Amino acid sequence: MPLHWTIDSKTKLLTAVAEGDVTRAEFESYLDMIDQAGLHTYRKLFDGMGADTSMGPEHILAMGVRMRTSHQTRPVGPLAVAVAEDKVAMFSRVLGMLAAATRPMRVFHDAGPARDWILKQPPGKSAAT
C-alpha cells in the first residue's frame, strides 16, 4: 500500500509515509482512520517525499475540503508535512487549507527536519481540556 502509518499513543504522534501513487481511496482510508481512532489532536508527521498521485486537481481539492471541514468542527494537533519541492505546486491549495487551522504547521522538503520539528511540538488540546 502506498500510504502507511504508525500511531504512537504514548507520545501522541501519528506518522504517515506515502510512497508511490497514492489514490483518493487510500487517502480517504487514512482520513477515516483518524476520525475513527479520534486522533485529531495528535501531532502528525506526513512524509510525502516518495509520493506521487494520479489524482486530478478536483480530487486533491476534495481531500482538502474534507480536512478543512474537520478542522472547523474539532481541535487539531500540530502538523509537519515533508513534500518534494517539485510537488509543492500540485498540493499548494490543500496546504493553504491546512495552514488555516488553528495549530502549528510547517512544510519541509526533507523528512528529517520535519520529524525534528514535530517532536518539539506539544500535542493539541482536546475540546474537554
Residue ranges and their predicted role:
Residues 1-129:
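Amphipathic, Lys/Arg-enriched alpha-helical "gate/interface" segment within cytosolic domains
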